[in-house]
Amino acid sequence: MYRSHTCGELRVEHAGQEVLLAGWVHRRRDHGPLIFIDLRDRYGLTQVVFDSAAAPTAHAVATDARIEYVLQVRGRVVQRPEEAYNPDLATGMIEVHATEATILNPAKNPPLYINKEGGEDETIRLKYRYLDLRRERMQRNIILRHRIVKFIRDFLDREGFVEIETPILIKSTPEGARDYLVPSRLHPGKFYALPQSPQQLKQLLMVAGFDRYFQIARCFRDEDQRADRQPEFTQLDMEMSFVDQDDVLDIIERLFTALCREITPHKRLLTPFPRLTFAEAMERFGSDKPDLRYGLELVNLGETVATSSFGVLRAALDNGGQVKGLRVPGAGHYSRKQIDEVVDLARQAGAKGLLWAIVPEMGGEVRSSFGKQVSPDEMTAIIRRMEGAPGDLLLIVADTPKIVAQTLDRLRREFGARLNLADPNTLAWAWVLDFPLVEWNDEEQRWDAVHHPFTAPKDEDLHLMDSDPGKVRAKAYDLILNGYEAGGGSIRIHQRDVQQRLFDLLGIDRETAMRQFGHMLEAFEYGAPPHGGIAPGIDRICMILADEVTIREVMAFPKTQQAVDLMTNAPSPVDERQLRELHIALRLD
């Protein structure tokens, strides 16, 4: 036996007992005759005292021990003097007086600090991830993730869901991103794909009669690693039969309300989850995933400036664009240099420029970038419409709806952070509903599915699919948490004729549809029930609940933003023999 107790287990009631501990040397303090070692495992720390007079052999071992050595210690639990209590440790009222000690394995000097945050470059942390994972913060995050997944499994089991594993080697079909392809040795020239999601398989499980399915699913997407993405990720994949949209939203809301109250009881949970339509979210926030922990809502100035003498404003409206503003409370003290930096942010977001005005104190003069282009009455009307108060900074964008939305969304998030408006201890879940079914792809001159090609259109919009597809709303819904998309889902098409109509709209001809999705179309002819589902992202939800800023901090072995595993050096070349077995020849041009 290597240990009788863990390093986080011993308390005052164990005083007088002989115990056996094993762990890593976390800290070592050498006071000559006395050596103090904090012994660590994932459960905590225990202070071990090595006395040269009482146990010279054990003291000699402690003399040789260094940081991160693996150590086994036998000793007696002793209550510390009251003045020596350490309130920061669960074991802080006791210490172990060593009688025997063994170095189970020495350790080289680690390239990063284990016993504190070292601020080293992330590449070092990822290269030596097995050391990084020894840190208290990382172990706390991984254990939090375990608790979240276990809670989900237990909750859904009580709700009558069945966990079913779907294949990892599947057929390659277009789902938005590029597939990771796996060559078949037994079938030369043919390939499997790693699933971007189990979407089609879970729908087929509904046809099979498993009316409540879930899976903690690994998914793979070979896409450019923009922002905080990973080539492989984990989602809670769910599907239900004989449900409408409200049924899906209800069970997810109950799941995550219960989960947050159990896992993060210290956080303020806003319930019930607000429901916004896609159009409302874009109008009020310029985003389909708004952070609802703070206001800073956008203001539509279309009517206010409809007859403006300022050509920039009028031209935007005449060309089908928008004029919207953002009121930033208390930012009127900004210097011209600071305002120029904000203008640069707007340009980075796609705007040609940014209009600004500072609301003066009573009787003062408005400072602005466009005061000479509008009349005093028009400026007053703009300030009144934006509910500007003295000392506020008003920001205005006039452009296409897309540019206006993405620019003001960028500025809203920027000032939400600068003004500390988002309470880190608040969880603001929300639903965004009624997304467009399709969107026009200017580059390829065709309609694309906004979510995926199996999303059902709203019944009342079916008649528009041929005449005005852009106005067709989908039975789709996104789950939002603190400004992040935490998951997406929809009610699915379950009738072959409707599915074929959508394929036709997307430019997928009948032959291609049968080749790529024939298994789905045929299944719909064998009594497919109405069904719908959702797939919340485990990595993202864990990140937010752990108060981290990147999903890499809640994954055991993540890859870099360039999809490289620095620890194992994957991807890596393979030898010619393996390629020949797979009938593959490389062409690197």
UniProtKB/Swiss-Prot annotation:
Binding site for ATP: R221, D222, E223, Q230, E485, G537, I538, D539, R540
Keywords per UniProt: Aminoacyl-tRNA synthetase, ATP-binding, Cytoplasm, Ligase, Nucleotide-binding, Protein biosynthesis
Location of region: Aspartate: 199-202
GO cellular component, one term: cytoplasm
GO molecular function: aspartate-tRNA ligase activity; aspartate-tRNA(Asn) ligase activity; ATP binding; nucleic acid binding
Family matches, as SUPFAM superfamilies: Class II aaRS and biotin synthetases (SSF55681), GAD domain-like (SSF55261), Nucleic acid-binding proteins (SSF50249)
Domain of life: Bacteria
InterPro entries: Aa-tRNA-synt_II (IPR004364), aa-tRNA-synth_II (IPR006195), aa-tRNA-synth_II/BPL/LPL (IPR045864), Asp-tRNA-ligase_1 (IPR004524), Asp-tRNA-ligase_1_N (IPR047089), Asp/Asn-tRNA-synth_IIb (IPR002312), AspRS_core (IPR047090), GAD-like_sf (IPR004115)
EC identifiers of the protein: 6.1.1.23
Protein localization: Cytoplasm
PANTHER family reported in the protein's UniProt record: ASPARTATE--TRNA LIGASE, MITOCHONDRIAL, ASPARTYL/LYSYL-TRNA SYNTHETASE
Family: Belongs to the class-II aminoacyl-tRNA synthetase family. Type 1 subfamily.
Task of the protein: Aspartyl-tRNA synthetase with relaxed tRNA specificity since it is able to aspartylate not only its cognate tRNA(Asp) but also tRNA(Asn). Reaction proceeds in two steps: L-aspartate is first activated by ATP to form Asp-AMP and then transferred to the acceptor end of tRNA(Asp/Asn).
Subunit annotation: Homodimer.
UniProt protein name: Aspartate--tRNA(Asp/Asn) ligase
Protein source organism: Roseiflexus castenholzii (strain DSM 13941 / HLO8)
